[in-house]
Protein backbone atom coordinates (compact mmCIF):
# COMPACT_ATOMS: atom_id res chain seq x y z
CA UNK A 1 0.00 0.00 0.00
CA UNK A 2 1.07 3.53 -0.65
CA UNK A 3 1.82 5.87 2.25
CA UNK A 4 -0.84 8.53 2.79
CA UNK A 5 0.07 12.23 2.68
CA UNK A 6 1.13 13.81 5.95
CA UNK A 7 -1.72 16.31 5.75
CA UNK A 8 -4.09 13.48 6.74
CA UNK A 9 -2.41 13.23 10.15
CA UNK A 10 -1.16 16.79 10.76
CA UNK A 11 -4.14 18.20 12.68
CA UNK A 12 -4.99 17.10 16.21
CA UNK A 13 -8.62 15.98 15.98
CA UNK A 14 -9.18 13.51 18.79
CA UNK A 15 -7.80 12.27 22.07
CA UNK A 16 -4.40 10.62 22.28
CA UNK A 17 -4.03 7.05 21.10
CA UNK A 18 -0.86 5.82 22.80
CA UNK A 19 -1.59 2.64 24.79
CA UNK A 20 0.51 0.09 22.91
CA UNK A 21 -0.32 -2.54 25.50
CA UNK A 22 -3.74 -3.01 23.90
CA UNK A 23 -2.64 -2.78 20.27
CA UNK A 24 -1.06 -5.45 18.17
CA UNK A 25 1.53 -4.62 15.56
CA UNK A 26 2.50 -1.00 16.12
CA UNK A 27 5.28 -0.16 13.63
CA UNK A 28 8.52 0.95 15.24
CA UNK A 29 9.72 4.53 15.08
CA UNK A 30 12.22 5.42 12.35
CA UNK A 31 13.92 7.85 14.73
CA UNK A 32 16.75 6.02 16.47
CA UNK A 33 19.21 8.79 17.47
CA UNK A 34 18.10 11.61 19.74
CA UNK A 35 21.55 12.96 20.67
CA UNK A 36 24.13 13.73 17.99
CA UNK A 37 27.54 15.34 17.77
CA UNK A 38 29.87 15.86 20.74
CA UNK A 39 27.78 14.46 23.60
CA UNK A 40 30.54 14.84 26.19
CA UNK A 41 31.10 18.58 25.66
CA UNK A 42 28.62 20.61 27.71
CA UNK A 43 30.47 23.93 27.40
CA UNK A 44 29.24 25.17 24.02
CA UNK A 45 28.47 28.88 24.56
CA UNK A 46 25.60 29.25 22.07
CA UNK A 47 22.36 27.26 22.11
CA UNK A 48 19.68 27.57 19.42
CA UNK A 49 16.29 25.88 19.29
CA UNK A 50 13.73 25.19 16.59
CA UNK A 51 10.19 26.01 17.79
CA UNK A 52 6.93 25.04 16.15
CA UNK A 53 4.32 27.79 15.87
CA UNK A 54 1.14 25.68 15.66
CA UNK A 55 -0.32 22.69 17.46
CA UNK A 56 0.03 19.63 15.23
CA UNK A 57 1.21 16.04 14.90
CA UNK A 58 4.59 15.36 13.29
CA UNK A 59 5.06 11.89 11.81
CA UNK A 60 8.15 9.93 12.78
CA UNK A 61 9.29 9.94 9.14
CA UNK A 62 9.25 13.76 9.09
CA UNK A 63 11.19 13.91 12.37
CA UNK A 64 13.80 11.52 10.98
CA UNK A 65 14.09 13.48 7.72
CA UNK A 66 14.56 16.74 9.65
CA UNK A 67 17.13 15.12 11.95
CA UNK A 68 19.16 13.70 9.05
CA UNK A 69 19.12 17.02 7.20
CA UNK A 70 20.22 19.09 10.20
CA UNK A 71 22.86 16.55 11.20
CA UNK A 72 24.32 16.42 7.68
CA UNK A 73 24.55 20.22 7.43
CA UNK A 74 26.17 20.46 10.86
CA UNK A 75 28.76 17.77 10.09
CA UNK A 76 29.67 19.47 6.78
CA UNK A 77 30.05 22.92 8.31
CA UNK A 78 31.35 22.28 11.84
CA UNK A 79 32.91 18.81 11.77
CA UNK A 80 31.84 15.74 13.74
CA UNK A 81 32.75 17.23 17.12
CA UNK A 82 31.89 20.89 16.55
CA UNK A 83 28.29 20.73 17.76
CA UNK A 84 25.75 18.96 19.95
CA UNK A 85 22.19 18.43 18.71
CA UNK A 86 19.23 16.99 20.60
CA UNK A 87 15.83 15.93 19.27
CA UNK A 88 13.42 16.85 22.07
CA UNK A 89 10.16 15.10 21.10
CA UNK A 90 9.24 11.42 20.89
CA UNK A 91 6.58 9.97 18.54
CA UNK A 92 4.18 8.41 21.09
CA UNK A 93 0.98 8.88 19.12
CA UNK A 94 -0.12 5.82 17.09
CA UNK A 95 -1.66 6.64 13.70
CA UNK A 96 -4.37 4.46 12.16
CA UNK A 97 -5.73 4.05 8.66
CA UNK A 98 -8.91 2.39 7.42
CA UNK A 99 -7.57 0.85 4.23
CA UNK A 100 -9.92 0.89 1.26
CA UNK A 101 -9.86 -1.59 -1.62
CA UNK A 102 -9.88 -0.06 -5.09
CA UNK A 103 -10.31 -1.41 -8.58
CA UNK A 104 -12.68 -3.86 -10.22
CA UNK A 105 -14.76 -5.85 -7.75
CA UNK A 106 -13.64 -3.80 -4.74
CA UNK A 107 -17.24 -3.37 -3.60
CA UNK A 108 -17.52 -7.14 -3.06
CA UNK A 109 -14.40 -7.50 -0.92
CA UNK A 110 -14.42 -4.28 1.11
CA UNK A 111 -16.72 -3.57 4.02
CA UNK A 112 -16.77 0.21 3.49
CA UNK A 113 -17.17 2.09 6.75
CA UNK A 114 -18.23 -0.95 8.78
CA UNK A 115 -15.69 -1.69 11.51
CA UNK A 116 -13.72 1.34 10.35
CA UNK A 117 -11.38 1.69 13.35
CA UNK A 118 -8.32 1.10 11.15
CA UNK A 119 -4.94 -0.57 11.40
CA UNK A 120 -1.81 0.92 12.96
CA UNK A 121 0.34 2.45 10.23
CA UNK A 122 2.87 4.65 12.04
CA UNK A 123 3.62 6.97 14.93
CA UNK A 124 3.68 10.73 15.43
CA UNK A 125 4.75 13.29 18.01
CA UNK A 126 2.07 15.66 19.26
CA UNK A 127 3.48 19.17 19.68
CA UNK A 128 2.04 22.38 21.12
CA UNK A 129 2.67 25.94 19.95
CA UNK A 130 6.17 27.23 20.79
CA UNK A 131 7.41 23.79 21.83
CA UNK A 132 11.09 23.09 21.13
CA UNK A 133 11.73 20.31 18.61
CA UNK A 134 15.52 20.50 18.12
CA UNK A 135 18.22 22.16 20.20
CA UNK A 136 21.74 22.76 18.84
CA UNK A 137 24.76 23.89 20.87
CA UNK A 138 27.78 25.31 18.99
CA UNK A 139 30.80 27.58 19.28
CA UNK A 140 30.55 31.25 18.27
CA UNK A 141 32.15 30.76 14.84
CA UNK A 142 29.60 28.03 13.96
CA UNK A 143 26.48 30.08 14.78
CA UNK A 144 25.52 30.73 11.14
CA UNK A 145 25.99 27.05 10.25
CA UNK A 146 23.74 25.96 13.14
CA UNK A 147 21.08 28.46 12.14
CA UNK A 148 21.19 27.20 8.54
CA UNK A 149 20.93 23.57 9.69
CA UNK A 150 17.88 24.32 11.84
CA UNK A 151 16.25 26.21 8.98
CA UNK A 152 16.71 23.20 6.68
CA UNK A 153 15.26 20.92 9.38
CA UNK A 154 12.24 23.20 9.73
CA UNK A 155 11.52 22.84 6.01
CA UNK A 156 10.91 19.11 6.54
CA UNK A 157 8.24 19.64 9.21
CA UNK A 158 4.50 20.10 8.54
CA UNK A 159 4.14 23.33 10.51
CA UNK A 160 5.70 26.81 10.44
CA UNK A 161 8.86 26.94 12.57
CA UNK A 162 10.96 29.62 14.22
CA UNK A 163 14.61 29.63 15.36
CA UNK A 164 15.36 31.18 18.75
CA UNK A 165 18.61 31.70 20.66
CA UNK A 166 18.38 30.09 24.10
CA UNK A 167 21.87 30.99 25.36
CA UNK A 168 24.66 33.23 24.11
CA UNK A 169 22.58 35.90 22.36
CA UNK A 170 25.08 38.55 23.46
CA UNK A 171 27.89 36.69 21.62
CA UNK A 172 26.23 36.88 18.20
CA UNK A 173 25.09 40.53 18.20
Swiss-Prot record:
Family: Belongs to the universal ribosomal protein uL16 family.
GO molecular function: structural constituent of ribosome
Gene that this polypeptide is encoded by: rpl10e
Protein name: Large ribosomal subunit protein uL16
UniProt keyword terms in alphabetical order: Ribonucleoprotein, Ribosomal protein
Top-level taxonomic group: Archaea
Listed CDD domains: Ribosomal_L16_L10e
Any one cellular-component term (Gene Ontology): ribosome
GO biological process, one term: translation
Pfam families: Ribosomal_L16
PANTHER family: 60S RIBOSOMAL PROTEIN L10
Amino acid sequence: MVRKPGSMYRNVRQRSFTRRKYMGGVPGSQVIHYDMGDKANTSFPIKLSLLVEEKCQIRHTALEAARITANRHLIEDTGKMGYYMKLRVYPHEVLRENKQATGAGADRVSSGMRRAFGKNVGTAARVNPFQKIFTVAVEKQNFVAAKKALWHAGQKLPTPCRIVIDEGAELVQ
